[in-house]
Amino acid sequence: MIFYFSGTGNSQWAAKTLALQTQDELYSIAKIIKTDCTFQLKKGEQVGFVFPVHGWRVPRIVRVFLQKLKLTDEEVQPLKHHCFCLMTAGDTIAQAMERFQQHLHETPIGRMLELDLVGSVIMPESYVGLPGMDVDTKEKELEKKQAAEIYLRDFGKKIIQKQKEDDYKPCGWKELTVGPLPWFFSVPVGGFFERFLITDKPFHVDSQRCVKCGICANVCPVADIKGGLGYEPEWLHNKKCLTCFACYHHCPHHAIEYGKRTVKKGQYFYNRYKVKENI
């Protein structure tokens, strides 16, 4: 089974692509986190996690899900199940994978899973919350998607073959796109992101452009937007916002802004013609 979280569709596409190769069942973390999150593993069944990097860290919703997830085994004396993790990012992931490994080990399911395959795939940029950060050009977007397709074909083969390395690190660790200064970006910068930049407070709507279609409320993965068809969006400020920018990117009239930081910036989500799937 593969558990995934996605805001603008990159990780959803990656998870679906892998599931087609591996024949694994897909579960949206944003949907199942509202349940008791209990699943039974079959003999030899593997578990995968696919999600984007947020501020060079694991998204809060994924961390909460790991704590809530309960896995049972049909075997009386079960062996550890194979586990893989794939992260999507616009550029680098820094120490996000190390942090995921730590989060996993700190949960009850960590005793049942053996993280033996990891990967990071570069996808079109969607973070627009800081000056100088914008979506990619159409040419760059296409280039990244084509490279990602090739990467996922190879990663899917490794999942099926249950590849391992003799080293103490999971297979694929050395190829992760950690970038320069990984500790700096994941620890002090990532901490700054979580404390000050992951918030819904700057979001606002331009009433002259808003057509009250309700798309923004529908695509919010944490139900942080009050509204719907016939209503302007109202952010709840309940500290659940992930700042994934799904609401901003999916607005068909570019009526949503994030303070002044998104003025004249572009929009992006993976599949522009199937809005309802990108949650």
Write out the residue ranges for each language-model feature.
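Short acidic active-site motifs
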Residues: T35-C37
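FMN-binding flavodoxin-like domain, especially the glycine-rich phosphate-binding loop
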Residues: I2, S6-W13, L20-I33, K42-F51, ...
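Iron-sulfur cluster-binding cysteine motifs and their immediate structural context
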Residues: V205, V211, I215-L236, K240-L242, ...
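Acidic, Ser/Thr-rich low-complexity intrinsically disordered segments
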Residues: L181-V222
